[in-house]
Curated annotation (Swiss-Prot):
Pfam families in alphabetical order: EFG_C, GTP_EFTU, GTP_EFTU_D2, LepA_C
Protein name (Swiss-Prot/TrEMBL): Elongation factor 4
Membrane topology value: Peripheral membrane protein
Role, per record: Required for accurate and efficient protein synthesis under certain stress conditions. May act as a fidelity factor of the translation reaction, by catalyzing a one-codon backward translocation of tRNAs on improperly translocated ribosomes. Back-translocation proceeds from a post-translocation (POST) complex to a pre-translocation (PRE) complex, thus giving elongation factor G a second chance to translocate the tRNAs correctly. Binds to ribosomes in a GTP-dependent manner.
Residue ranges of domain tr-type G in the record: 2-184
Keyword Hydrolase: yes
GO biological process per UniProt: positive regulation of translation
Example GO molecular function: translation elongation factor activity
Gene behind the chain: lepA
EC number: 3.6.5.n1
Length: 598
């Protein structure tokens, strides 16, 4: 056991985690030269296209150190985006240490900080690594200084390496073996294994990634899931070297995969503890704290026949992504679907794309909203995650919106632009600290503004140098209103949005103008209105198409023309009473962009 090292690689987006993993795999000979590819651990095609890591991946390698001993390295490559921070915290729970990778050109960024504190909270040993020293812009001394100033861990002898060229990677491995402690655990104790992650395989059923904390797990053992009390047979188990390799036994302290032929998706939830049926452990391991979704949106299949397969797909996906939340919802405009909760907009985009690709579904999304706390006049508190669930205005005593605490790091020269942006987003400054050339800003900004497009705007005002980390702080009373969209005097529930009263006029007008461009012209006038309660704040009309009924009158009597025009008018009026307006898919997506292109 003293020759096992479990560690994660944590860093900000694009600081070179996945490339460093590639080098480590190469040095330890986990894959042959032929099988090696760039970012070999980003196995989803979505990950490869966007060049980001979405799922944490684990690998087991053997490393022959300079002291002649062979060490078993179990490491987990983690995502860098704030939307997938749950993946990171789960991976860290399975480790004794973490490699903190910092780009020597960019220096410390917000996610570096957030992930590092997560690791330190779990009492892990953090080993700083300065990456990308081959870049002309690299300044490793400044980066090391920043790590000490901002993060507060000793970085005087941080390893300097370049994952791309492979310089210094052997030193990283030596440092790992030296600084990160071996796993603590008792091989003789009853089995306790933590489920870090699981996914659904069409042939094998549920495959789980487990970390054996105490005891050993053998092929053919009867395994008991502690939360449900059900028992399964351990059919196959093994390790990843990124390839799946079968083994007969997983020892204490190891990380490996397990197949128990579980067909039920909820059979072995993530964060649960596995033990042996014949000598069970007394208590379960502490799991993971549940994360609360920050953004909610409705997902609806375009054709209602897909509802069943959509439900199954969501089930399988939520097994793989423990932070996804969903419940059935029905809408008059869109039929049956699900209300889903996500950690952020990127998470939402990824989930939607995964559903469409991996399960061949065609989906419509409604506008994302955050959760509001509403105190009704009858003194009860309800949480509202969709505009259609908001009680009528006269029943609301007060409405509170979620406030996010945003930590931003940026070079000094962009400070002015960023502050202007934060004020525009109704932010309140709580803290500002200078570290050398970097400024750390803390703002309290309404969650609704943060999830909409704050990140994109922050990146563009700071030329990509500013970085952001945010978390939910509290609910705060605010003057929010629901803007309804009426088309020919009928409310369309899927188009409603909740916004601040100050922005409501602007938002309403913009939404109505957008809808006007997207709804095709019909044989009659279509009135598009935005309303708060009964008060109409904006209107646009899509003009009717009409035939020139006077074409056949050459000169002639004016009363004849009047008669023909009146006849046409009456016909249009009758048509308007019975006519239905088909809304194109783009109309629902228009909401997503309201307030973006200022």
């Amino acid at each position: 056991m003293k020759h096992i090292r479990n560690f994660s690689i944590i860093a900000h987006i694009d600081h070179g985690k996945s490339t460093l993993s590639d080098r480590i795999i190469q040095i330890c000979g986990g894959l042959t030269e032929r099988e090696m590819a760039a970012q070999v651990l980003d196995s989803m095609d979505l990950e490869r296209e966007r060049g980001i890591t979405i799922k944490a991946q684990s690998v087991t390698l053997d490393y022959k150190a300079q002291d002649g001993q062979t060490y078993q390295l179990n490491f987990i490559d983690t995502p860098g985006h704030v939307d997938f921070s749950y993946e990171v915290s789960r991976s860290l729970a399975a480790c004794e240490g973490a490699l903190l990778v910092v780009d020597a050109g960019q220096g410390v960024e917000a996610q570096t900080l957030a992930n590092c504190y997560t690791a330190l909270d779990m009492n892990l040993e953090v080993v700083p690594v300065l990456n990308k020293i081959d870049l002309p812009a690299a300044d490793p001394d400044r980066a090391a200084q920043e790590i000490e100033d901002i993060v507060g861990i000793d970085a005087t002898d941080a390893v300097r390496c370049s994952a791309k060229t492979g310089v210094g990677v052997p030193e990283v491995l030596e440092r790992l073996v030296r600084d990160i402690p071996g796993p603590a655990g008792d091989p003789e104790a009853p089995l306790q294994a933590l489920i870090i992650d699981s996914w659904f395989d069409n042939y094998l059923g549920v495959v789980s990634l487990v970390r054996v904390k105490n005891g050993t797990m053998r092929k053919g053992d009867k395994i008991k899931v502690m939360s449900t009390g059900q028992t399964y047979n351990a059919d196959r188990l093994g390790i990843f070297t990124p390839k799946r390799v079968d083994r007969d036994v997983l020892n204490c302290g190891e990380v490996g995969w397990l197949v128990c032929a579980i067909k039920d998706i909820l059979g072995a939830p993530v964060g649960d503890t596995l033990t042996l049926a014949r000598q069970p452990a007394d208590k379960a391991l502490p799991g993971f704290k549940k994360v609360k979704p920050q953004v909610y949106a409705g997902l609806f299949p375009i054709s209602s026949d897909d509802y069943e397969s959509f439900r199954d797909a969501l089930g399988k996906l939520s097994l793989n992504d423990a932070s996804l939340f969903y419940e059935p919802e029905s809408s008059t405009a869109l039929g049956f679907g699900f209300r889903c909760g996500f950690l952020g907009l990127l998470h939402m985009e990824i989930i939607q794309e995964r559903l469409e690709r991996e399960y061949d579904l065609e989906l419509i999304t409604t506008a994302p909203t955050v959760v509001y706390e509403v105190e009704t006049t009858s003194k009860e508190t309800i949480y509202v995650d969709s505009p259609s669930k908001l009680p009528p205005l006269n029943n609301i005593e007060e409405l509170r919106e979620p406030i996010a605490e945003c930590h931003m790091l940026m070079p000094q020269e962009f400070l002015g632009n960023v502050i202007t942006l934060c004020i525009e987003k109704r932010g309140v400054q709580t803290n500002m600290v200078y570290h050398g050339n970097q400024v750390a800003l803390t703002y309290e900004i309404p969650m609704a503004e943060v999830v909409l497009d704050f990140f994109d705007r922050l990146k563009s005002t700071s030329r990509g140098y500013a970085s952001l980390d945010y978390n939910f702080k509290r609910f705060q009373t605010s003057d929010m209103v629901r803007v309804d969209v009426l088309i020919n005097n009928e409310r369309v529930d899927a188009l409603a949005l909740i916004t601040h009263r100050d922005n409501s006029q602007y938002r309403g007008r913009e939404l109505v103008e957008k809808m006007k461009e997207l709804i095709p012209r019909q044989q009659f006038d279509i009135a598009i209105q935005a309303a708060i309660g009964t008060h109409i704040i904006a209107r646009a009309t899509v003009k009717q198409l009409r035939k020139n009924v006077l074409a056949k009158c050459y000169g002639g009597d004016v009363s004849r023309k009047k008669k023909l025009l009146q006849k046409q008018k009456d016909g249009k009026k009758r048509m308007k009473q019975v006519g239905n307006v088909e809304l194109p898919q783009e109309a629902f997506l228009a909401i997503l962009h309201v307030g973006k292109d200022k």
